[in-house]
Amino acid sequence: MKCPFCSSEDTKVVDSRTTIDGSTKRRRECNNCLKRFSTYERFEESPIYVVKKDNRRVKYDREKLLRGLTFATAKRNVSREELDKIITDIERSLQNSLISEISSKDLGEKVLEKLRELDQVAYVRFASVYKEFDDIKSFIEIVEEIKKD
């Protein structure tokens, strides 16, 4: 690893840690100038595409999913770390399955499954947008479904 300060390639790893998203943070020290710096290593993942209802294919966007989850959990006792964990779990599951595409329907179902375990109000909020509720009956049905559990 090349030192960002003096460009020497003579560096050593002082400390390594796995971060919440699965990447590895390494603290390094240059043997030439003795300065320290951090590097992050992450597996290169194959891109995943989301197939929309109209059959368009768009590249999976972690930030878009985070925005949807943030909206669904607004004013709920759900931390950013919990949302990151949901997203990371879904991403790992997709990478492990070795698929290159997922339908927006299947992705939405995976999110709903995670939200149902985490917060029932957020689950109903997300479902109302994802399933395009257009009347109060849809809300009543989903609440009744939750009450059965």
UniProtKB/Swiss-Prot annotation:
Cofactor note: Binds 1 zinc ion.
InterPro entries: ATP-cone_dom, NrdR-like_N, RNR_NrdR-like
Domain ATP-cone: 48-138
Keywords, ordered alphabetically: ATP-binding, DNA-binding, Metal-binding, Nucleotide-binding, Repressor, Transcription, Transcription regulation, Zinc, Zinc-finger
GO molecular function: ATP binding; double-stranded DNA binding; zinc ion binding
GO biological process: negative regulation of DNA-templated transcription
Stretches that traverse the bilayer: none
Zn finger intervals (unnamed): 3-33
Family designation: Belongs to the NrdR family.
Protein name: Transcriptional repressor NrdR
Gene field: nrdR
